[in-house]
Design a protein with these regions (language model features):
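Glycine-rich beta-strand-turn "strand-cap" elements at beta-sheet edges
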Residues: 2, 38-49, 74-96
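Short, well-ordered beta-strand segments in beta-rich or mixed alpha/beta enzyme
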Residues: 2-9, 38-68
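Residue-level signal for secondary-structure boundary sites
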Residues: 14-16, 61-63, 95
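Short amphipathic alpha-helical segments
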Residues: 14-37, 70-75
Length: 96
């Protein structure tokens, strides 16, 4: 199990619109990928401009097997709403 932890800077005035567009493009795309488990969107408790995407994958290999061309197509579909996140990756050591 691997967790992809992305942090986006999103203007609070644009948050709801951005979340809807992000869900329409990125969430629907990810749901179709082999190895995708789950995705949640979190707002930082101490900074309302920070939105965190927590994405669970069955394995790093499945996550990294997504073709770059497919990722590029989603970026293009997001248009001006695409945001470059900071990213961290976590590997599961123990469950429970």
């Amino acid at each position: 199990m691997v967790i992809e932890f992305l942090t986006f800077d999103v203007d609070p005035a644009e948050r709801e619109t951005w979340l809807q567009i992000e869900e329409r493009h990125w969430s629907r795309f990810l749901e179709q990928q082999d190895g995708f488990v789950s995705k949640q969107m979190w707002q930082s408790a101490d900074d309302e401009t920070k939105i965190h995407a927590v994405i669970w994958w069955e394995s790093m290999e499945q996550w990294k097997a997504i073709p770059q061309e497919a990722l590029d197509a989603v970026v293009e579909a997001m248009g001006p709403h695409e945001k470059e996140p900071s990213m961290k990756v976590y590997n599961l050591l123990r469950d429970g």
